[in-house]
């Protein structure tokens, strides 16, 4: 669980650092130069409150969702025999953890988004554009990398422990197929991030007029390119793992599910002569 938690937190921490630095440079600093001295104080307070509450809530919620998988893995390592119903639950929960941490991250970023403008106040229209831009970039980061990294841990390390002879069903294959489809969407998000940052840099740099902000976007662009390479590697490993897990699920499936998956009603019946 600690490994998954760190893999989910790291992209969000990096996104929070970028969000703070970018908003400080393009919004708060110009506001103080315009004589709005309270903007700096309100921004600092809102950053502390939002990040403390957001990271605490996100961590607690993910620990709650991942705890059954952690306990199931501990029981497996201690030689405890797990019931088929519990194994089915653990397989589903294990595969969904990547999607859960991505949704938790995005939801918390969306909720936190309006807090900064409301706390600071006295914003110009361009400041709202910068807030939305920063939020969109951080949302992509918060969704993409936690999903791929946590899903990689689940498919590569954890899932096989919850497969036992006769315990798998057609629902397991269906969920594996869903994860197979989701991974393509997150890979496209990872690939879109560098292009989004470059486009925003070209559009916003003349408007911002800040060299530091341009450097931040440049660093994020190179970081997004490196992140895409990592995301592509995770994607390929997950793809191979899913193919193996589908074979294992089929091999350990029940005869009932085999009959449900394939319709033999049209085949001729061979009788005794």
What is each PLM-predicted segment?
Residues 1-222:
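N-terminal sensory and localization modules of signal-transduction and trafficking proteins
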Residues 78-89, 167, 253-271:
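Solvent-exposed, non-transmembrane helices and loops of integral membrane proteins
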Residues 119, 252-253:
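Hydrophobic residues in alpha-helical segments
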Residues 169, 223, 227, 243-246:
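Sparse, context-dependent recognition of short Cys/His-centered cofactor- or disulfide-binding micro-motifs
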Residues 187, 223-239:
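Cytosolic-side ends of inner-membrane transmembrane helices, especially those
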Residues 233-252, 259-273:
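HAMP signal relay modules and closely related sensory coiled-coil linkers
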């Amino acid at each position: 669980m600690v490994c998954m938690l760190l893999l989910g937190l790291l992209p969000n921490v990096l996104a929070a650092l970028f969000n703070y630095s970018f908003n400080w440079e393009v919004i708060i600093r110009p506001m103080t130069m315009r004589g709005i001295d309270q903007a700096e104080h309100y921004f600092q307070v809102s950053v502390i409150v939002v990040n403390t509450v957001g990271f605490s809530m996100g961590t607690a919620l993910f620990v709650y969702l991942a705890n059954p998988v952690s306990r199931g893995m501990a029981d497996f390592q201690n030689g405890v025999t797990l019931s088929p119903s519990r194994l089915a639950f653990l397989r589903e929960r294990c595969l969904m953890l990547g999607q859960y941490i991505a949704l938790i991250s995005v939801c918390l970023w969306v909720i936190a988004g309006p807090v900064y403008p409301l706390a600071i106040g006295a914003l110009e229209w361009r400041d709202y554009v910068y807030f939305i831009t920063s939020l969109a970039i951080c949302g992509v980061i918060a969704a993409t990398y936690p999903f791929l990294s946590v899903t990689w841990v689940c498919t590569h390390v954890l899932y096989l422990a919850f497969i036992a002879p006769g315990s798998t069903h057609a629902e397991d294959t269906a969920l594996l197929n869903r994860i197979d489809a989701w991974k393509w969407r997150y890979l496209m998000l990872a690939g879109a991030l560098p292009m989004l940052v470059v486009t925003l840099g070209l559009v916003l740099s003349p408007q911002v007029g800040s060299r530091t902000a341009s450097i931040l976007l440049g660093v994020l662009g190179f970081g997004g390119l490196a992140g895409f390479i990592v995301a592509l590697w995770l994607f390929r490993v997950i793809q191979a793992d899913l193919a193996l897990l589908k074979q294992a699920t089929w091999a350990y499936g029940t005869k009932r599910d085999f009959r449900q998956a394939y319709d033999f009603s049209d085949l001729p019946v061979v009788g005794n002569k």
